[in-house]
Amino acid sequence: VETASEKNFSRLENFPLNIWEQDIAVGLTGSYLCTKYFGFQISQNKDGGSIVNISSDLGVMAPDQRLYEEEGIPKDQQNVKPVTYSVVKSGLIGLTRYIATYWSDKNVRCNAMCPGGVENGQPGDFLDKVHARIPMNRLAKSDEYQGTLLWMLSDASSYLNGAIISVDGGRTAW
């Protein structure tokens, strides 16, 4: 299981190239290197194995920047979800699909889990806005992803390869 990310809130028109490069290096290049080295090792096992990349619901949909707006701050100065977050997370989906076909002859499966957010003390007004965009009307609890992840890694999902599985309370269904 592999996941890497950096948080840098900055508006697109002011987003520094060095932060772009840093975020891509951590989130995408880091994942590529882990997959390259550990995936190769898995491919040498006679029984193969499973790789699960952790993407995000924001790897399959654009972030709703209105969620991050704060009253009293001009629109052009509002914090936003950084451009690199969705770029990295959608890039992980591409990497997952590539690896799913690359080592499939060696019984290496590669899938991606795309979790939504976790409720962890965010402000109430933010949670209200997020909940309104999720059919289950809530964010996940911290232990609600492990069942899906364990299944994806287990032999119970032995024919699952190249799948992009959203675990987001239905958010990406809308």
Regions flagged by a language model, labelled:
Residues R109-E119, L153, S166-D168:
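Conserved SDR Rossmann-fold cofactor-binding beta-strand/turn motif
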Residues V1-E21, P63-N79, T84, Q122-D128:
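Conserved mid-core segment of classical short-chain dehydrogenase/reductases
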Residues E6-Y32, V52, Y85-V87, L92, ...:
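Catalytic Tyr-X3-Lys loop
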Residues I134-Y145, A156:
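A conserved structural motif in NAD(P)-dependent oxidoreductases
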Residues S104-R109, L160-G162:
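Short, small/polar-rich loop/turn modules that mediate ligand/substrate recognition or access, typified
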Residues G30-T35, S50, V60, L92, ...:
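Conserved internal alpha-helix within the Rossmann fold of NAD(P)-dependent oxidoreductases
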Residues F9, E70-I73, L150, N161-W174:
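Short C-terminal tail/terminal secondary-structure segment
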Residues V26-K46, L58-A62, A100-T101, D105, ...:
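Amphipathic alpha-helical dimer-interface segment in Rossmann-like NAD(P)H-dependent oxidoreductases
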